[in-house]
Amino acid sequence: MARSKTAQPKHSLRKIAVVVATAVSGMSVYAQAAVEPKEDTITVTAAPAPQESAWGPAATIAARQSATGTKTDTPIQKVPQSISVVTAEEMALHQPKSVKEALSYTPGVSVGTRGASNTYDHLIIRGFAAEGQSQNNYLNGLKLQGNFYNDAVIDPYMLERAEIMRGPVSVLYGKSSPGGLLNMVSKRPTTEPLKEVQFKAGTDSLFQTGFDFSDSLDDDGVYSYRLTGLARSANAQQKGSEEQRYAIAPAFTWRPDDKTNFTFLSYFQNEPETGYYGWLPKEGTVEPLPNGKRLPTDFNEGAKNNTYSRNEKMVGYSFDHEFNDTFTVRQNLRFAENKTSQNSVYGYGVCSDPANAYSKQCAALAPADKGHYLARKYVVDDEKLQNFSVDTQLQSKFATGDIDHTLLTGVDFMRMRNDINAWFGYDDSVPLLNLYNPVNTDFDFNAKDPANSGPYRILNKQKQTGVYVQDQAQWDKVLVTLGGRYDWADQESLNRVAGTTDKRDDKQFTWRGGVNYLFDNGVTPYFSYSESFEPSSQVGKDGNIFAPSKGKQYEVGVKYVPEDRPIVVTGAVYNLTKTNNLMADPEGSFFSVEGGEIRARGVEIEAKAALSASVNVVGSYTYTDAEYTTDTTYKGNTPAQVPKHMASLWADYTFFDGPLSGLTLGTGGRYTGSSYGDPANSFKVGSYTVVDALVRYDLARVGMAGSNVALHVNNLFDREYVASCFNTYGCFWGAERQVVATATFRF
């Protein structure tokens, strides 16, 4: 029996009513019992199920609430921007190894930026990636601030939901990529007992075991805990690379009454090996080598002793207190420490590639051999990043006449420090690799020849303070959302080798305005304007860090979220522009200059529906028309890794009657259109379609309620494809067929 969160005398009657209602209807409902003394009967009236929370689980694949777009618990149809939510229920259907894999059926999101590699969750949203190598990913509303190679990742098994907000978001979050962000919500303690153990085995010698335990620590539900963890070991797709991950997430909630909630959240993850993180040339992948052959999809151009490890530690809390019907205060806080270490040899294109024009090894080859010898470089890198973030909000609900307001005021602060101790090998620092007869050997990463390599020791510091205000004002069926934010963003880079320091302090105001019209039938058209800014970490030829880029977006859309059915259908048309993009110096120096512009226009459609207890459907379509509208070199071109068309469709069916009762069958397809492989648009990466499948059996039929066994297959027909390229020397094979058997037991 579920334990109540607070001790109230009337709960005993409610518990009796639940038992009676369950016996009568065969399904659990929340109920209230009324006993009339004149009659020897009990009248049971079913009450609505508890309302979904933006910070908690959703009952189906179609989540109806989100806090990512407003920082308040808001119905999705009331947010004047596009939001997609991948619930734990949907993740359970696919059992993804990474969060980016969990987003494979989400519109507007390119997840193939690194092909089969699971080292990072790098995404391109509406044609834009985060500045540099960093991700634009958040956990519980606070940014997982990364720097250089030091980006944190969260395992999807630890999450309640993963949400994509598309378009500029600086009005709430400060510095950000104009394309949007990923916000993940951690699993939190429950007052109902949860005991889950999971086992996985599959392709590439995958073995994983996980556990998820939660319960109240007292009869009144004041104290509760959750402990989630996993251990995973697998071979990466590329020969010689491995993936190892050990993670645990202890959480504890103190809820003294129904108006106060304090939840301690933590996450500890150790990855002795993060897998493959190299790249391959277009020759042998997109195009055949001179001998007419292509490289195998498990090809690894690195050294045999390549290593790449990461360690993450995060502790923090989420606190909220409702003073009365008007005022609620919330605060999210987290301290994180991330360490990465790598010794990596990586490819840098065949010798005939202009990128290797200064290589002496390549110059010594006969012209006929330059097309099948791969130039390589290396990096030795150790980093330690510390990040502190806190976001404090005051929510005020009140009315002015006929207008209901939800006013949010807040201030957030972020401080990041990343100490980089690296050594880079340049041209000719690693022997060439014959792609006709490749022999991977160990590499001496300690040699560090100053003739062709050098140190890179940098201490990067960043700070951001932002104050913001947002009003969600509703008059009858009209909802107006208006918000503004002012940021102070400071960055400092100390070059320990040269003994120089680069600094830049930026101040920026951004705002968003939107209007929604809420029809009674669940249809909600909307219009919005939003802005973003994103500081640069690069330095110009004058020695100064560049000014931030800025984003502006106009979006028109419609959402359909009926009150009585778990269906969410959204569609949007947008025009998004990024100004002050960096571009090549027209005077021919090796430095970039400011003043570039990229524009993206697009259409996105998404549908998520639990059409019945048996049928789930997820579908999406994306059209993205991205272009360098101002650039000294690439004007009129399309950015690399941005397909014009993407589409996906998934459906699953569960049998509840007959001999197949308890069986779930599912299948889906993901289409990615062709994309350009470099900013010069000198070649294209072909389109591809992959098919996924699911077979799952509910063990309740054999007396094990809540448990199941399943077989998940991604890329069912083992389609060979190049996921994307960012340049002529940087292409990525897509994931091969993955077959994973899963056994989940609840007791």
From Swiss-Prot:
Q: Which PROSITE patterns does this entry report, sorted A to Z? A: TONB_DEPENDENT_REC_1, TONB_DEPENDENT_REC_2, TONB_DEPENDENT_REC_3
Activity regulation, in the record's words, is: Binding of ferrichrome or colicin M enhances the interaction between FhuA and TonB. TonB activates FhuA through interaction with the beta-barrel.
What does the record say about its membrane topology?
Multi-pass membrane protein
Which stretches make up the TBDR plug domain? 75-187
Please state, per the UniProt record, what induces or represses the expression of this protein. Answer: Induced 1.6-fold by hydroxyurea.
| Positions occupied by motif TonB box | 40-47
Spell out the InterPro entries in the cross-references: Plug_dom, Plug_dom_sf, TonB-dep_rcpt-like, TonB-dep_rcpt_b-brl, TonB_box_CS, TonB_rcpt_b-brl_sf, TonB_rcpt_CS, TonB_sidphr_rcpt
Provide Extracellular-side residue ranges.
202-206, 232-245, 269-312, 336-387, 414-464, 487-508, 532-551, 575-601, 623-645, 671-689, 715-737
Q: Which Gene Ontology cellular component annotation is one that this UniProt entry carries?
A: transmembrane transporter complex
Q: What family is this?
A: Belongs to the TonB-dependent receptor family.
Which protein, by its recorded name, is this?
A: Ferrichrome outer membrane transporter/phage receptor
Which organism was this protein described from?
Answer: Escherichia coli (strain K12)
Task: Give the gene that encodes this protein.
Answer: fhuA
